[in-house]
Amino acid sequence: MTETAEMPQAGPQPGALWRKALGRTHDRLIFSRRVQVLVEALAAHVPQGGTLLDVGTGDGHIARLVADRTGAEVRGIDIMRRPRTHIPVDLFDGAVLPRGDASVDAVSFVDVLHHTPDPGALIREAARVAKDAVIIKDHLSENALDHATLRAMDWVGNAPHGVVLPYNYASRAQWLDWFAAAGLEVEAFETRVPLYPFPLSAVFGRGLHFVARLRPVRGK
């Protein structure tokens, strides 16, 4: 009888191993601090005891912590539902928020809009759905260096998790245009968001991040 040699099993590709190692390093050095800073910054703008819709919530971890601090009733929506989430999550089509006009106290986007093809359209949807506030954490890109830095940050933080990366960054002027077109009044626009420890903050901080609280202006 002729023995058949077993074919060697293909192991993980070098690129996949590199991305996983990079993701673990990012999580260890940056993720915990990022969560803490974001929760503090966002909770300052969420109506106490209100209702919060978190768009692009992922596993809902940050939204859950914000709700715990503010007493808000929170629910998330996303284009896909993860097996385990920290909050209830509904699916949506990525374009129309599945809620009625002025049906929740606040709508939040946490590093979501730059992953979408048309941030302005989603901002208009948030203005329609939110009664009191639209809260946005995202990036500012004013020049080629900003764009390159944000691309690198996005790749390191998201590529290991298979996140789609359109690198759709906007300048402050573009964000303000989107807010105005949606009928949103800027109540706060904070660019001092200390997500990174020194010396990383000198490269990856420097005004590349913002947290904004916007108020829907009805009847204009």
Regions found by a protein language model. Name each.
Residues 108:
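A conserved beta-strand element that flanks and buttresses the S-adenosyl-L-methionine
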Residues 132-139:
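Conserved beta-strand signature within the Rossmann-like core of class I S-adenosyl-L-methionine
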Residues 41, 64, 139-199:
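C-terminal alpha-helical "lid/dimerization" subdomain adjacent to the S-adenosyl-L-methionine
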Residues 15-36:
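Class I SAM-dependent methyltransferase Rossmann-like catalytic core
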